[in-house]
Amino acid sequence: GKSGSWEATDYSENMIIEAEKRNQGEHKCEQLRFCVQDATNLTYEDEKFDVVVIANALHIMPQPEKALKEIHRVLKKDGILFAPTFVYKKGYSKFLIWLMEKAGFKTYHKWQSEELKEYVGSEGFQVVGAALIKGKPLSEYVLVGKKE
């Protein structure tokens, strides 16, 4: 098959350092590069990537539309977005959310699955696949979008 390269990014320099430590030894991936990036202001040129994964991040961003705009910019024509994101059930426990935020898990967006699907669809992506992975306390909605 065709081999390519991978770019792993995070907003936190400490997370990048930890990821680099884990990419060592006999299972080291030579095609993997690590870089600190702000998803709302990426330093990559336009239409650089075939695929972008933004995992468990959209709901913790004050302005996720900025990240989606940047992802749209750096994706090639017909590029694919994978966006696994924590979602909430209708009537979720306000107490549970309060408790999670006190523990440091701050969320700005408490989307339900269909709300997230509509949101991403309104930001320049055609939703071509989605799956709900049930979990406790939160479920995860794995959304696949194609750049329009």
Q: Residue ranges of each PLM-predicted region?
A:
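Class I SAM-dependent methyltransferase SAM/SAH-binding core
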Residues: 1-41
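Short glycine-centered segments of the SAM/dcSAM-binding site in methyltransferase folds
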Residues: 5, 79-80
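Short N-terminal helix/helix-N-cap motif within the alpha/beta-hydrolase-1
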Residues: 14, 62-66
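A short acidic, Gly/Pro-enriched loop at the edge of an enzyme's catalytic core
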Residues: 37-52
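A short SAM/SAH-binding and catalytic strip from SAM-dependent methyltransferases
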Residues: 51-63
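A short glycine-rich, Lys/Arg-flanked "PGG" loop and its adjoining helix->strand segment in the class I
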Residues: 65-77
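C-terminal alpha-helical "lid/dimerization" subdomain adjacent to the S-adenosyl-L-methionine
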Residues: 82-141
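C-terminal lobe and adjacent flexible extensions of AdoMet/dcAdoMet transferase-like proteins
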Residues: 143-148
